[in-house]
Amino acid sequence: MYIYINNEIEELIECAKKIPILNNNENGNDHNKSISKLITIFKSKQRSRSSSFSLDTLNFNLSSSSSNSIEIDDENPYNTNNNNNSNNNNNNNNNNCNNSNNSNNNKNINSLDNIDINNNNKNNFNDCSSYSSFSSSECLSDIGNSCIDSLELFRLSDDIEEESEMIFNQVGPDRYNDLANIFSKSHKNLTILLKDINRDTLDCSECIDGSLSDNEWEKCLCCGDIHSLGDYKHVECIGKGGYGVVCKFINKKTNEIRAIKTIRKDYSALKEINTLKELGGQFTVNIFHTFLSPCKEKVLIEMEYLSGGDCAFHLNDVGVGFPEELAKQYTAETVLCLDFIHEKSIIHCDIKPNNMVIDSDGHIKLLDFGNAKKFNQKKPTSNDGILGSPRYISPEVLLFEPQSPAVDYWSLGIVMFELITGTTPFIGETPEEIFESILSRNTECIEIQKDAKDLIIKLLDPNPSTRIGSKDIKNHPYFNGINWDTIKTSQPIWKPNSSNNFITSINGCCKLINSF
């Protein structure tokens, strides 16, 4: 149920006034037709996004949500970020409020020629436009994993929809005012709920509005003792991408080596921090302190330094895939990592070798939870746009369908293929070409071991409801001989050297640090 929060009462009533109503006529049928026009306006944005996927016919339903856009990082085209503030909106104007079923919303795409990668559509109805809206599920995504009692949001959404339906089924002009009251009450209830479930971290309404002061940011970010960049000695830059930059530092107080990640100061930063706090570090990177940069424009996250580097570095270093047993070990450990975060009702949404980092003991940990989502165990999470790296994105994400932990298992199938062969199964020179390859199932023809191939095929099932899950993955013949209880603590097959496991840059990073 979408909750309209931008002068919702005034705009709703003004919109209602523009629809001819027979106030002095008892003709209920005509009145119901008028009411149905108003209902169409509010229900248009929550219309189902379900799309069918098959090898013969691919249907792509463009969502009217303003969040469905892709931002391609110029320096790293395989890092994509959801762009909620795009200025390239494509406005579709309908001259009649009742004409919300635009036939252009359904496009056949045996190729992706009809897809606008920067699609940021907002359906503007004549005299009924300029609504600022979000759904409870979108709000969950926005505030992310600080929402401890996220199910309350879904209950609130269901209550609003049920009460609205009761009003829709009434007869009489008072329904307009009743409907306005529902939207007003829903906004108030949502605000109270968000403040309650985020009282220990952040008032989400302030975060969404971007109105937090520097002092409020520092209060939200406080994790342990108060720190500043002056407490660390910079060593080198060890990572850079669409998320920001990661540098190696030495903590002057403890003389411990740390990694500090620098990201934009927005609610996605708080989402990632809250996620990492919740996960605790057994299967994910540990965080110790969070604080603002000296210029107050960036968020700095002090994390454990994982000396082994990421799998992407080592794949690039060897130029081909890993030895079979090492690829199997890393795949198995990633399965355990996914088990852990999924039990916490979190979907990573960006599983790839770059985010699989090897710790000092030679075992895999996950990092970069900037795209992570909370999900409801009883129903899939809404799709807020194409998030992740093109080569690892699942079909349901590309088709703007609801998401579940199955999106991580699709990415695991891509990663497994890459760990074995050194390349990904779906390729292209641009993100669009990669997406077309994924949807058309055009894969690289590379011979691999029989059991490995069978598992990859099951992981890359285009239907998320039949895609193989954790239990069946662990029981697959490919993992015969793997002890799932001890693999994360046993002696690894190979342990990287303690140094030279990163593509480092000292001078360039110094300039960046000085700009903080």
Curated annotation (Swiss-Prot):
Sample GO molecular function, one term: protein serine/threonine kinase activity
Domain of life where this protein originates: Eukaryota
Compositionally biased residues, Low complexity: 79-115
Pfam families referenced in this protein's UniProt entry, alphabetically: Pkinase
Top-level class of the enzyme under EC nomenclature: transferase
Domain called Protein kinase: residue spans: 232-479
Positions annotated to bind ATP: I238, G239, K240, G241, G242, Y243, G244, V245, V246, K261
UniProt keyword Kinase present: yes
Keyword Zinc-finger: no
Enzyme Commission designation: 2.7.11.1
Active site: D350 (proton acceptor)
Disulfide bridge partners, by residue number: none
GO terms (BP aspect): intracellular signal transduction
Entry keyword set: ATP-binding, Kinase, Nucleotide-binding, Serine/threonine-protein kinase, Transferase
Region (Disordered): 69-115
Catalyzed reaction equations: L-seryl-[protein] + ATP = O-phospho-L-seryl-[protein] + ADP + H(+); L-threonyl-[protein] + ATP = O-phospho-L-threonyl-[protein] + ADP + H(+)
Family: Belongs to the protein kinase superfamily. AGC Ser/Thr protein kinase family.
Name under which the protein is recorded: Probable serine/threonine-protein kinase DDB_G0293276
Originating organism: Dictyostelium discoideum (Social amoeba)
